[in-house]
Amino acid sequence: PDRTVRSLTITRIVTVNLQTDEIGQYLYRQELPANSNSEMVGLSATDFLVLERDGSFLYGGPNGAAGVTPDAQKQVYRIDLSTGTNLETVALLPGMVQDPDLGLTINGKTLEQVVLEGGWEALAAVGIYPVDKTLALDMVVAANYPHDKMEGLWRIDDSHLGVLNDDDFATWSTGGVLEQKMLDDATIDAGRLY
């Protein structure tokens, strides 16, 4: 595929069974195109918490008041792999091929290209579905999360979850000039555990 598929809501989750070396591959549907999924925490063999975020700052970041983003997305979803199609073991219909370089293709197109041209409905039409997900935590609502990045999840126990930000060493580059990474007009970003 080319760069046109980068701004989609489709991403993949790959699993490896360490006892059998069996590989699984599942689709995850993001809330917004080009969001990031930078962390997963296992709850069981099929249940996971997945971090999903955009790159915006709740209070404007380096752009100050002009960059305020009240709808910033910093969320954790609970997923169940057993609800999605395992792309490694899917029954191949006419036109489907397990390409050694591109993975499962449909009529010569990657799944990303299929979604680009026909939406998620085009995959559903051939029996391919993403994993189900439910919102477990919205950090903007729960903690007024001001950072652009959520990068770490820590399952403390069955009732507590730690969330870590990535402050990029509190630096930011604008036009190639290195400067302090700001959360708003007055606050320098810093690493923090929530």
Could you describe each region identified by the protein language model?
Residues P1-Y194:
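Sequence/structural signature of beta-propeller domains
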